[in-house]
């Protein structure tokens, strides 16, 4: 996300996830100990990986009501700006990074577009993923004409799996606010 130029990070967490907040907090005890022991190189490594003050925000999802609900919980922090969603359980390793490519694509479109990163999966595994139905193709981009979360075997509209990287416009919050619950009683983003 840093490679893509993201400057503010918002984490939506649930109950018993305070360790995530602690991870991104400044570890002044460790810094003090390293200084006392003359470990300047280690202090520099800590400083390089430490987010700037105010660059990280946390909000709580009070109940596990799905990804759409988690995104909606961040609405007051996001405000009226386009934003990225990065799911931590999906590791996407590309050079340049997936999110950087998506932000560059969004900028090149020059319009308010929502982007979703996808990856082809074997047809026999589509029932395990959120899958996009696609329409018109333009290079590496497809127009999405539908999405289905974990379709029944043999019913997927394509083999393009949603990989947990999104560029979204703030208008999505109004849609999520009135979204009906879907699979598993959750408010889905897909």
Q: Where would I find each of the regions flagged by the language model?
A:
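N-terminal glycine-rich phosphate-binding loop and ensuing alpha1 helix
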Residues: 1-41, 61, 97-104
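Short loop/turn motifs at secondary-structure junctions
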Residues: 5-7, 79, 143
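A conserved hydrophobic position in a structured secondary element of the catalytic/binding core
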Residues: 15, 86, 94, 167-168
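General structural feature for long, well-ordered alpha-helical segments within catalytic domains
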Residues: 16-19, 70, 98, 102, ...
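Conserved beta-loop-beta/alpha segment of the NTase-like Rossmann-fold superfamily
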Residues: 30-32, 42, 46-134, 177
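Catalytic-core segments of class I nucleotidyltransferases/pyrophosphorylases
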Residues: 84, 107, 137-190
């Amino acid at each position: 996300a840093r490679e893509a130029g993201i400057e503010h990070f918002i984490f939506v967490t649930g109950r018993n996830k305070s360790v995530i907040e602690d991870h991104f907090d400044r570890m002044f005890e460790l810094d003090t100990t390293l200084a006392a022991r003359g470990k300047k190189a280690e202090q520099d490594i800590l400083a390089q990986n430490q987010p700037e003050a105010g660059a990280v925000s946390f909000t709580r999802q009070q109940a596990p009501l799905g990804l759409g609900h988690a995104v909606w919980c961040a609405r007051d922090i996001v405000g009226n700006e386009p934003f990225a969603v990065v799911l931590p359980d999906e590791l996407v390793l590309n050079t340049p990074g997936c999110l950087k490519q998506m932000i560059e694509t969004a900028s090149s479109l020059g319009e308010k577009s929502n982007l979703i990163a996808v990856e082809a999966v074997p047809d026999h595994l589509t029932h395990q993923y959120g899958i996009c139905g696609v329409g018109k193709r333009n290079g590496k981009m497809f127009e999405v004409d539908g999405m289905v979360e974990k379709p029944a075997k043999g019913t997927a509209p394509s083999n393009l799996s949603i990989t947990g990287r999104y560029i979204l416009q703030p208008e999505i919050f109004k849609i999520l606010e009135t979204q009906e619950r879907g699979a598993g009683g959750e408010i889905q983003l897909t």
